């Protein structure tokens, strides 16, 4: 599972085979073959790929988004486009573009990069004309303000995850009540504060399994105090115990 994150690129995930769970702020989408997930600019999102899943991931940089509008940061497209067998459906046309891009990427013939770029613009055209969403300026400004505060909190967690952080620490960082902080964090990340903190710790722990330090030392280093709960979540995410993962990657 990828950690919740954000970027200025427009990100699209097209599922070729298998299943995937996608999270965008407080929305959850269960994707299957032919479905498309779209993470809008600067919105917090993450995905969980199930075993055996194949997918295409495309990130479209701001330079291309500016061709749609100078105010590209406010662009919002439909996040989830479900696969449809109906002739001429949006999902079918977008899927054909992704398959074409995949073919061109693998062929790597002369001029294929230009053809690939033309497919990106064809995709953007379909999104702009058939999947664009409009939000009121007042609501958008409020969302942007709150979203920036939550991003600052996530960066704070990344910097201090090894410490014994609590919900009260997160609320104090934003100078709000714990109740308001809970609602705000859940709204923009789709996770609880403690759930996200646990994921950050688990990710750093997993990365260090390739080293030689004892597992008990890694647990302590990354602020993990309840091993029983951690082990359950680790097996849910990676399908194995830390010891099994270490043997596999050693």
Question: Whereabouts are the PLM-identified features?
Answer:
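Short helix-to-turn junction characteristic of helix-turn-helix DNA-binding domains
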Residues: 101, 157-160, 208-209
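Basic/polar phosphate-binding segments, predominantly the helix-turn-helix DNA-binding elements
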Residues: 158, 164-202, 219-248
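Short, Lys/Arg-enriched, Trp-marked, Pro/Gly-tolerant hinge/linker segments that flank
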Residues: 79-90, 105-116, 124-155, 159, ...
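A hydrophobic/aromatic-rich effector-binding and dimerization subdomain
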Residues: 38-107, 124-136
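N-terminal hydrophobic signal/anchor transmembrane helix of membrane proteins
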Residues: 3, 111-113, 246
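Residue at a beta-strand N-cap/secondary-structure junction
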Residues: 21, 164, 212-213
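Generic protein-terminus/edge-of-domain signal
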Residues: 1-32, 36, 49-51, 69-78, ...
